[in-house]
Amino acid sequence: MQGKIIKGIAGFCYVDVAESGIYECKAKGIFRKEKKKPLVGDNVEIEVLDEKEKTGNLIQILPRKNELIRPAAANVDQALVIFAVRQPDPNYQLLDRFLITMEQQEIPSIICFNKKDLAEQEELDQMYQIYISCGYQVLLTSAEQEEGISQIRKILEGKTTVVAGPSGVGKSSLTNLLQEEVSMETGEISKKLKRGRHTTRHAQLLTVGEHTYLMDTPGFSSLFVERMEKEELRFHYPEFVEYEGKCRFQGCVHVHEPECAVKQAVEEGKIHRQRYENYVSFYEELKEQEKRRY
């Protein structure tokens, strides 16, 4: 029987088998021997021990499409990054940091600016324009007024989505609205998942529709690009791609070099200055990390 791990805790994996519900499974010793750790999001094969009690053994981890390090998760289709338009004001450097991390892992990102009811249309248009011009999908929502929820639901359908964003942006409100239509068979599932005194510091997938899962990411603000060379950073800015190879110097990193096509595009307003300034700041940060390494 196949399913997806939606939570792992204290040696148990909770596996969602679409038609049959959630099974509490123990990972067999062979995984420890092979040093293969089951992750939330893993598609797995289980053997059922007790159908009534919904218990079983994990017998195989199916091949992974991808694997995130922080949070530890597998088979992520996309990321939904949520910031508020106001209260708190968006931290664009933090947003760009997250986008780079996802670009590095080839996971497409959708940007959601929540609390749109707190800003004027002109300001919303500016925010929208910055990231649309880089090729990202951008949503403007209001959890308070339940605006844009059906649009998010459509984008999430049939996918496993990592949800990220700093605190206070309305992440929980949006997640609750998305879960509203799913009864969650509340009693049994939540009883099974809440066994033991554990908080949600553990990665967990929330079911928001058939084969549709959301994963919250704790520790968002401490995020940074791990294991990246400074020369690699430019490849994680989609808006730089069309200028690659058009600079005077081969291997131009678009920081101090003369006759740089990217810097020229910034001057001409084709690349947003704020995005470029964040790029330079990250480049210098990686340069410092490199110095400390050697």
Regions found by a protein language model. Name each.
Residues M1-I9:
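Structural detector for short beta-strands of small beta-barrel domains
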Residues G11, G29, K35-K52, L62-Q78, ...:
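Helix-rich effector regions associated with P-loop NTPase G domains
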Residues C13-V17, C25, I46:
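SH3/SH3-like beta-barrel fold
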Residues G21-I30:
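Short, structured beta-strand/loop micro-motifs enriched in basic residues and often containing a Trp
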Residues E51-I61, D89-N91:
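Short, Lys/Arg- and Gly-enriched loop/turn segments at beta-strand edges
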Residues R86-G135:
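Phosphate-binding glycine-rich loops and their immediate beta-loop-alpha structural context
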Residues D117-V169:
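Canonical P-loop GTPase G-domain recognition
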